[in-house]
């Protein structure tokens, strides 16, 4: 059926008279590929956001007319052009046009701009996206399992973008339902303001938020150790759950690490699904940079510059985006209108404007150097790591080496096996998984020891 859609699409494009659309638009249409039909909409993939804007800007009505004529027997009358990054969103039913905002409360203009169309989805955040999909599912078992949804991760990994996009998607899909957004400090300030006015104002504040069909509460850790504020939240939480509402929470730590809360509150927070949003790696950061510049077509930036920025800031998306804004500001005010942003340009502007970007590019290590350093840190001989000896301390060192070679040098399992005297794929994969599982428990002694070693590279 997919091939049939492409054939019908190609036929429709050939029928469009040349004088109705530009040569550029026609070339874009010729290279476009049909993706899938969902809810009566045929999604068509173009190369990038710039091409998408050209088609949607001036020619969409003409194109839709000819497509509708060709697809009328298929009962398809709506057509949407998307970019490759949006395919997963289509598959998850997450690509929703942002329209009505009347059912969103306490959403800033910035929050309203967040959506899944401009979010890079990769390994570091994919589980969170899937969890949100389950929370919003019509399947009661899937939805209740994820309610409340507790997303945790370090500062700057994109938690706000994800939950705001989720709120906007839910609002557009459910125009008659109410969505509330609160950040911990903001909730505390408004509670204090209501308290000063009297008990009735506190009750009204509570009643308003408790009426939410979806409550998004960020940085829950900011109300720990504030007993009256936490108690109010506890009551709101219970009311929303009793009324069949949904709750998404974020924090920089897991529920069990929120030591300032009473146990009954921690128990409620952990009663649904917990999902970690990891820090993106360098390659994922480059994807984010590419996506960011995709929507800012007037800038040209070299791959070397992207790698330089990603290397320095791939663990903190927020800081990285801040640096991109700073760099684009310099480019906007440069007298060279044909400017290409290079690595050297970024460094020169940083020095000239006395605004350090704090990009620290770490030394590149060779595989043998990594093996030597790990051996030294763990006080064993280098050749023992490559040996077949199965003593616990040697296996431990070997596991760490496998993890670092994979995650720092991006070596294949085959390459790692060759370095370690022909070890099999399954053995290498098991070592990497074992270390990752330890690292997921960030506060364990083993994780702390591994991180001390990893941070040397």
Curated annotation (Swiss-Prot):
Residues 332-457 are annotated as: Domain IV, binds dsDNA. Keywords: ATP-binding, Cytoplasm, DNA replication, DNA-binding, Lipid-binding, Nucleotide-binding. One of its GO terms (molecular function) is DNA replication origin binding. InterPro entries: Chromosome_initiator_DnaA (IPR001957), Chromosome_initiator_DnaA-like (IPR020591), Chromosome_initiator_DnaA_CS (IPR018312), DnaA_C (IPR013159), DnaA_dom (IPR013317), P-loop_NTPase (IPR027417), Trp_repressor/repl_initiator (IPR010921). The keyword Metal-binding does not apply. Its main location: cytoplasm. Plays an essential role in the initiation and regulation of chromosomal replication. ATP-DnaA binds to the origin of replication (oriC) to initiate formation of the DNA replication initiation complex once per cell cycle. Binds the DnaA box (a 9 base pair repeat at the origin) and separates the double-stranded (ds)DNA. Forms a right-handed helical filament on oriC DNA; dsDNA binds to the exterior of the filament while single-stranded (ss)DNA is stabiized in the filament's interior. Domain I is involved in oligomerization and binding regulators, domain II is flexibile and of varying length in different bacteria, domain III forms the AAA+ region, while domain IV binds dsDNA. PANTHER family: CHROMOSOMAL REPLICATION INITIATOR PROTEIN DNAA. Belongs to the DnaA family. This is Chromosomal replication initiator protein DnaA. It comes from Ureaplasma parvum serovar 3 (strain ATCC 700970). The lineage of its organism: Bacteria, Bacillati, Mycoplasmatota, Mycoplasmoidales, Mycoplasmoidaceae. The gene is dnaA.
């Amino acid at each position: 059926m997919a091939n049939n859609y492409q054939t019908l699409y190609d036929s429709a494009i050939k029928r469009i008279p040349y004088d109705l659309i530009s040569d550029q638009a026609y070339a874009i249409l010729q290279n476009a590929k049909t993706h899938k039909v969902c809810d009566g909409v045929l999604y068509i993939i173009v190369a990038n956001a710039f091409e998408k804007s050209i088609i949607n800007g001036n020619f969409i009505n003409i194109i839709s007319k000819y497509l509708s004529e060709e697809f009328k027997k298929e009962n398809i009358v709506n057509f949407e052009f998307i970019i490759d990054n949006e395919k997963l969103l289509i598959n998850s039913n997450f690509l929703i046009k942002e329209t009505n905002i009347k059912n969103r409360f306490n959403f800033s203009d910035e929050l309203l701009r967040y959506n899944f169309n401009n979010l890079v989805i990769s390994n570091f955040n994919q589980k969170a996206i899937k969890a949100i999909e389950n929370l919003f599912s019509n399947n009661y078992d899937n939805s209740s399992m994820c309610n409340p949804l507790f997303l945790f991760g370090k500062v700057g990994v994109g938690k706000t973008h994800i939950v705001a996009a989720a709120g906007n998607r839910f609002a557009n899909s459910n125009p008659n339902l109410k969505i509330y957004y609160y950040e911990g400090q903001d909730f505390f300030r408004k509670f204090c303001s209501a308290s000063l006015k009297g008990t009735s104002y506190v009750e009204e504040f509570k009643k308003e938020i408790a009426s939410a069909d979806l409550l998004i509460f960020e940085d829950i850790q900011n109300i720990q150790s504030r007993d009256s504020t936490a108690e109010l939240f506890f009551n709101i939480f219970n009311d929303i759950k009793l009324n069949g509402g949904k709750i998404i929470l974020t924090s920089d730590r897991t529920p069990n690490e929120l030591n300032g809360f009473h146990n009954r509150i921690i128990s409620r927070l952990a009663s649904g699904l917990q999902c970690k949003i990891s820090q993106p790696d360098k390659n994922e950061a480059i994807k984010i940079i590419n996506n960011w510049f995709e929507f800012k077509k007037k800038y040209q930036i070299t791959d070397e510059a992207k790698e330089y920025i990603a290397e320095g800031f791939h663990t903190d998306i927020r800081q990285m985006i801040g640096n991109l804004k700073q760099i684009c500001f310099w480019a906007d005010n440069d007298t060279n209108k044909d400017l290409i942003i290079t690595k050297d340009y970024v460094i020169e502007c940083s020095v000239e404007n006395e605004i350090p970007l704090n990009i620290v590019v770490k030394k590149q290590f060779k595989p043998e150097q990594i093996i030597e350093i790990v051996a030294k840190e763990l006080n064993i001989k280098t050749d023992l790591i490559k040996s077949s000896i199965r003593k616990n301390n040697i296996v431990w060192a070997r596991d760490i080496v496998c993890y670092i070679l994979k995650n720092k040098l991006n070596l294949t399992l085959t390459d790692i096996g060759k370095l370690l005297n022909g070890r099999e794929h399954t053995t290498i994969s098991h070592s990497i998984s074992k270390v990752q599982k330890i690292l997921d428990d960030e506060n364990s002694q083993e994780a702390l020891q591994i991180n001390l070693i990893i941070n040397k590279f």
